[in-house]
Amino acid sequence: MRDSIKILVKCPTCGKPLMNPDVMLDDLSSIDLETKIGKKVGHIYLSQVYGSYNKKFDGVDDTEGVICSLFCPHCGNPFPLYQTCECKAPIVGLQLQAGGTIKICSRNGCKNHSLEFTDVNDAFKLFQSQDKTGLG
């Protein structure tokens, strides 16, 4: 993971950071998403290291293949849907603190994700924010 990029995200609706220092993954604060799977509501914590698929579930089951409804843990709004993944699940977007969007598939276990920038300067800001290890 030495050459990986650290992703810091915020809610695209309320603008509050989604980083949770109380739940660590890959030795870094996790990305905290509220989720609803079936009738259960809980949290999914994702690694902030781009390309790491480490995650932790709290209050909901870690069931491979299930589609997760994802919400901001602060304002409760659902994250915007951008398109449908090849696996037929919705792709949601989280706002990067440096600018731009990270899009992730909402199906547990699907590894489809991407970084998108409207302004190329936001991409440069993200890369410049990384230290020499790439982990900030």
Q: Which sequence ranges carry the predicted segments?
A:
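Short Cys/His-rich Zn2+-coordinating modules
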Residues: V49-G59, T63-P73, E86-V92
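Short functional micro-motifs and their immediate structural scaffolds
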Residues: K16-N20, N77-P80, P90-Q95, C110-L115
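Short metal-binding segments enriched for Cys and/or His
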Residues: K36-D61, T101-L126
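N-terminal alpha-helical interaction blocks
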Residues: M1-Y50, G134-L135
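Short metal-coordination and nucleic-acid-contact micro-motifs, chiefly zinc-binding Cys/His arrays
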Residues: S4-I7, G65-C68, P78-Q83, G99-S106
